Design a protein with these regions (language model features):
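Residue-level detection of beta-strand-connecting loop/turn positions
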Residues: 82, 124, 131-132, 209-211, ...
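Beta-rich globular "head" domains
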Residues: 188-205, 270, 504-519
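Beta-propeller and closely related beta-pinwheel folds
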Residues: 52-61, 98-106, 251-409, 447
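Hydrophobic or amphipathic alpha-helical targeting/insertion segments
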Residues: 108-157
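Extracellular Ig-like/FN3 beta-sandwich strand-entry sites
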Residues: 235-239, 555-557
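Beta-sheet repeat architectures centered on beta-propellers
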Residues: 1-117, 350-354, 361-365, 372, ...
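A general sequence property marking short-to-moderate contiguous segments
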Residues: 47-50, 140-177, 283-289, 392, ...
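Extended beta-strand solenoid/passenger and fiber regions
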Residues: 137-234, 245-257
Length: 565
């Protein structure tokens, strides 16, 4: 056991990240670290974060940034205020842009690529872009009945005498097709719906053995009864296909007003519609232009909004806002079905702690933000029970006090989960984890402060893009923040050397620090003695091992802070 006169040597190393918990901070963590991280692609050292380089200014709020490659040509689209722009000379500055659309929603948009087509949604629009043309998504026209006799009854040649429905109604289009076999006697054909849309909305069409027929020229329509009368009676066994329009109640807006989407099981799932707070919709297999009117699932009965839909562990997790006396977690499991091939019944989870902002599948860890911080979902066998595992105790005291906490935005970047809140970024490190006192696995964290308020964040091919309210778009690179110095520091935890009540004196032999050589001539070292800054020393990192001295007497605890701009 050491006596009071013993020389105690400290070796501070294997630094892991920050600890803002105000508890006993480990020697490997810092209670006060700013704008530093570990770039695993470069070295294992803690170093200053990259800078922010201005790419362009678009004179309105950045709400979306989309990269799309078609035939080896990269297309860059930017959602700026109410406009969707094509950045034709990316990444050159100033930007040369082409307006593709001028009625975008003033909220953050999202995208996905399906069958080499870029699809974009913003809460009021559902658009597609093929590299040349941007247009509203045109829904696949379903064949809602077939093998019909002219009177609408089932054909005697069919395999069954029940009324067959070939394809359900598509929410993304008002159009439907009916197929018949002509009997050589009937001019009137009964459709499978009545009270059709007016002729001003859609002039009906038909084909007889693939020969096009047009309303008011080749046939007339009784829209109230859904009856088509041909001028010339179709021949026996001729194939008659009639296309008509019947708008379903709020069908289109079910999907257009969704604010969340994700790909799962070769389908696109949609949710977040404020008018359908419990609903999750999905498209048909490999067809994002077709959302049948029965393809939705109710997650709960309350008005708590769905905040996140996250694929993970072969299910789709549905996370809702906090609601008293009700589960906030549901999951949809792919299930074989004789009618629709696949359905996704909703199962009530066992977690009631609500999601207050968003969530993500972070390297196979399904996480979301509650009013207590970042939570991870762990499963018992067969999903019979879900268990919450806390992931952010090291930064909760600071992160939860952020005024914009409920509007946190997420991006994965170089193995980190970046949690953006205004101008602050909290970085969860997927490669450094620890087990807390409750045996939960948590992340190590870093913390950045940016010189500009940032409202948009996106990662693409290991590049990080940041946008703001005034239309500035930055990329994370370089050694300055758009020519401004980056102030960074790392403070070792308070150390009383095992004797809290006794005073100490530093040894005259001094200290050494192991630097990564970055040719920085302005590394400042401060000593913080019993809470007061005492000394300042300026060092250079031209050598890897650099000696320095600390001269302090009669202190109870001491810290060392390294800083640089």
């Amino acid at each position: 056991m050491s006596s009071l006169n013993d020389l105690i040597t400290r070796n501070y190393n294997n630094f892991r990240g920050v600890d803002f918990s105000n508890n006993n901070v480990s020697f490997s963590r810092s209670p006060d670290m700013l704008n530093m991280w570990r770039d695993y692609q470069d070295s294992d050292c803690i170093q200053t974060r990259p800078g922010m380089k201005l790419l362009n200014t678009f004179n309105n709020k950045i709400l979306g940034l989309f990269f799309y490659i078609k035939e080896d040509i990269q297309h860059v689209l930017v959602h700026v205020g109410p406009k969707l722009l094509k950045w034709t000379n990316y990444p050159n500055m100033p930007a040369t842009t082409q307006e593709l659309y001028t009625s975008m929603n003033i909220q953050e948009s999202r995208s996905f690529v399906f069958d080499n087509i870029l699809f974009i949604m913003d809460g009021i629009n559902y658009l597609e872009y093929d590299g040349e043309t941007l247009k509203k998504v045109e829904g696949t026209v379903p064949m809602t009945s077939y093998y019909k006799n002219p009177d609408g009854s089932t054909s005697i040649d069919s395999d069954t005498d029940i009324d067959l429905v070939y394809q359900p109604v598509n929410c993304l289009t008002s159009l439907r097709k009916n197929a018949f076999f002509g009997d050589g006697k009937s001019a009137k054909y009964q459709l499978d719906a009545q009270e059709l849309d007016s002729v001003s909305k859609y002039l009906m069409e038909a084909t007889i053995n693939n020969v096009k027929k047009v309303e008011n020229i080749d046939f007339i329509v009784d829209r109230d009864k859904g009856i088509v009368t041909f001028n010339d009676i179709p021949e026996k066994d001729s194939e008659v296909v009639i296309t008509y329009s019947k708008t379903g109640k709020d069908h289109l807006n079910r999907i257009l007003n969704c604010t969340l989407s994700c790909e799962f099981d070769n389908r696109i799932f949609f949710s977040g519609n404020p008018n359908y707070p419990n609903s999750v919709f999905h498209c048909e297999l490999n067809d994002p232009r077709y959302v049948r009117d029965t393809a939705y699932y109710e997650c709960g009965l309350n008005l708590a909004q769905v905040k996140a839909i996250i694929p993970g562990n072969n299910v789709l997790w549905v996370l809702k806002d906090l609601e008293q006396n009700s589960s906030s977690l549901y999951y949809l499991t792919p299930t074989l079905d004789s009618t629709y091939n696949k359905i996704y019944p909703s199962v009530n989870g066992s977690i009631s702690l609500g999601c207050v902002s968003c969530g993500i599948n972070f390297n196979d860890d399904v996480v979301f933000f509650s009013n207590k911080g970042l939570e991870g979902i762990s499963n018992s066998s067969l999903y019979s029970e879900q268990i919450l595992k806390h992931r952010s105790s090291l930064v909760d005291s600071k992160m939860l006090s952020e005024t914009g906490y409920k509007d946190v935005k997420l991006a994965e970047y170089k193995g980190y989960l970046l949690c953006l809140i205004d101008s602050h970024i909290y970085l969860a490190d997927s490669r450094k984890k620890f087990q807390n006192n409750s045996n939960d696995i948590e992340y190590e964290w870093f913390y950045w402060e940016l010189p500009f308020s940032i409202t948009f964040i996106k990662e693409y091919r290991e590049n990080l893009y940041l946008g703001n309210e005034i239309g500035q778009l930055f990329i994370l690179e370089g050694k300055t923040d758009n020519s401004k110095d980056i102030n960074s520091h790392f403070t070792i935890c308070k150390d009383n050397f095992g004797y809290q009540g006794y005073t100490k004196t530093t040894n005259k032999r001094g200290n050494v620090v192991d630097f990564k050589i970055m040719n920085n001539d302005n590394i400042k070292i401060d000593t913080i003695v019993d809470g007061t800054i005492k000394e300042k020393t300026v060092l250079s990192d031209k050598n890897e091992i650099v000696p320095f001295r600390i001269k302090d007497k009669k202190f109870k605890e001491i810290q060392v802070r390294f800083s640089s701009n």
